[in-house]
């Protein structure tokens, strides 16, 4: 039987100083409000987009909802970058959130591609297809952030 080696030390998501800055900044509350709001708008918008694709009705409502979702995405990205600066000392790509930030740029690119399709008069089906692709990447990215939120909670429990 082979002796077992001790597990690699767990890398904490936040240092004590970063956790203190995270807990003290108003940008944490802003993110905590914007994230569920964006998800609510996403869920409504997804329903409207799927309704339009299924029935051919409701293009204006679907479009308006995608624009609202895109505005919220841009807002949460800007405020999230400010939050990272306050907590980690850099606007983007802090090691703790590097891959979430990388994937976020894909989400932004697809939402921006939707805006291009809308404002250049591309066919409605193409617009909605791009929106669905943007929404699929958003769901993955939201999952990344939810995972990090869980890791932060587990870190906090381990620290107590």
Curated annotation (Swiss-Prot):
InterPro entries: BCHF. Its EC number is 4.2.1.-. GO terms for molecular function: hydro-lyase activity. This is 2-vinyl bacteriochlorophyllide hydratase. Disulfide bonds: none annotated. The keyword Lyase applies. It comes from Cereibacter sphaeroides (strain ATCC 17023 / DSM 158 / JCM 6121 / CCUG 31486 / LMG 2827 / NBRC 12203 / NCIMB 8253 / ATH 2.4.1.). Keywords: Bacteriochlorophyll biosynthesis, Chlorophyll biosynthesis, Lyase, Photosynthesis. Pathway: Porphyrin-containing compound metabolism; bacteriochlorophyll biosynthesis (light-independent). GO terms for biological process: light-independent bacteriochlorophyll biosynthetic process; photosynthesis, dark reaction.
